[in-house]
C-alpha cells in the first residue's frame, strides 16, 4: 500500500540506505520531502553507511561521484547513529533499535527486514516513495 500521509502513528522515523541516497541525486527524487509529507520527522543513517558514502565519494567518478557527494550533503538532515554491526546489518539493527521504517531499494535487505517485522519503504520508478507499513 502507498503511504497515506502518516496515518500510522507508530512509525515516525526512517532509516535510509545508501542506494536511496544515491538515487535522490541521480533521479532527482525528493525522498526526504515525501517522507515528511507522510508524517516522518526523524531521519537516521548509520555511521557504517556514512563511511560507505565517504568511500564511494573517493572511489567513484562522474555522476556517481557527484551523487555520493550530494548524498553526504543531504546527511545534514539526518541523525548519524552508531551500531555494533556494519553494512546492511547495521540498517536492520538501527531500524529495530529506534523503531523506524527502513527505506531501501535492495530487495534482499527488504526481505530480511520484513522477516524481522520491520516496515519497509522503497522508491518506485516514478520517483515516488512507496511505504509498506505493518499492522
Curated annotation (Swiss-Prot):
Keyword Nuclease among UniProt keywords: yes
UniProt cofactor(s): Mg(2+)
GO MF annotation, one: RNA nuclease activity
Domain PINc residue range list: 15-118
Top-rank taxon: Archaea
Hydrolase is among the record's keywords: yes
Keywords, in A-Z order: Hydrolase, Magnesium, Metal-binding, Nuclease, Toxin-antitoxin system
InterPro entries found in the cross-reference section: PIN-like_dom_sf, PIN_9, PIN_dom, VapC_family
CDD domains: PIN_VapC_AF0591-like (cd09879)
Root EC class: hydrolase
UniProt: Mg(2+) binding residues: 17, 88
Documented EC number(s): 3.1.-.-
Family: Belongs to the PINc/VapC protein family.
Subunit structure comment from the entry: Dimer.
Reported function: Toxic component of a type II toxin-antitoxin (TA) system. An RNase.
Protein name in the entry: Ribonuclease VapC9
